[in-house]
Amino acid sequence: MNAKLLTVAGLLSCTTAISAQEENKSGYQFTDVAKINVTSVKNQASTGTCWCFATTSFIEAELLRMGKGEYDLSEMFIVRQKYMNQLQDNYIRRGKGTLGQGSITNAWKNAFNEVGIVPEEVYDGINYDSDKHNHRELNQYLRAIADVAIKNKHRSPEYYKLIDNLFDTYLGELPAKFTYKGKEYTPKSFAASLGLNMDDYIELTSFTHQPYYQQFAPEVPDNWERKLMYNLPLDELINVTDHALKNGYTVCWDGDVSEKGFSHKNGVAINPEVKKLEDMSGTDRARFEKMDEKARLEEAYKFEALCPEVNVTPEIRQEGYESFVTTDDHLMHLTGIVKDQNGTKYYVTKNSWGTERNTFGGYLNMSESYVRAKTIYILVHKDGIPKDIKKKLGI
């Protein structure tokens, strides 16, 4: 896109700044509604570890909110323990578990409770000839070793040595002790020093095939730990997200980014409406009435002008889930709210694809319509949930 500048309000960490009032060539003008300081954008590179990068970013933002200061925590320290937990689960399930690189926020919390955490400078998780993460070969070897154990119906001492050596080779040896800012820690004592309680962080979802205000395990492959989540009506899920962001609590988001309306390159994610012209404004309707549906979509996906979006109901959302159109592709970090010149709400979203893949510092804005349709679940601190909703959930 040949834009001189695409401004996405709040699309920046506490170390970057672009005015929300500047206008981009494509016609999007964003104004801040809520903006929370967070740490810098990282790059998961050639790995399927978005779940860890998003959750780590979320936790780092929590430490900022708590007045603990700025931390750069090691994603790969957590990823390594997640792989260990997957291997255990897969073996107990007779090889029917999940050994992929993906996961969800619960895997981060469990790993943190089990082994603690270390700073990135202590364990960067790259022990091979690269300056970026790449787990393709690592994951292939992991699967091969796991398959042998399943075939033999036994995990020998050599099996455990092979696994440890595999991770040491690709990710580096785990530190028993380390010094950080002049003080000696173990991974567990460093985790304790942060003052975090994983029980404070709540997963919330919204689907109609399960009762509201009760917990269930969303049926997505990356929920291999079968984590129970609270089920809310869709409007209340959005209410939680808004309330949290407006009160200084960021939100970790899991959802579908496979749609054409999701454009990291253009810094936006939208959910165009091309059928119900009667719901459009006069200007939009006059413009879209001259086109067929295909042309309307093509126009919307140029990202050169604002377009009307789908009014997403619980039924529309559920249809996407049950037709497997909506999947748990990706986790990201919601760090604020902006509105465009028409007053449409968007969520400021910190991605983990580095800062070079778009001109907005690695951020984008996802419209409310897109978020309503494509969210699988969110993670938020319990104090970021409105009191009336907490009461309904018994939290």
Regions found by a protein language model. Give the residues of each.
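Short, positively charged
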Residues: 22-27, 309
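Active-site signature of cysteine proteases
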Residues: 161-168, 172-395
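A generic secondary-structure boundary signal that marks alpha-helix termini
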Residues: 16, 59-60, 343
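A broadly tuned, weak detector of single residues within folded domains
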Residues: 3-6, 13, 43, 105, ...
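Short, glycine/serine-rich, charged loops/turns that create anion-binding
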Residues: 12, 57, 257-258
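Bacterial Sec-dependent N-terminal signal peptides
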Residues: 1-23
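N-terminal, helix-rich and Lys/Arg-enriched segments in bacterial and organellar proteins
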Residues: 5-6, 12, 47, 51, ...
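Active-site nucleophile-adjacent alpha helix/oxyanion-hole segment immediately C-terminal to the catalytic cysteine
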Residues: 25-212, 216-254, 358
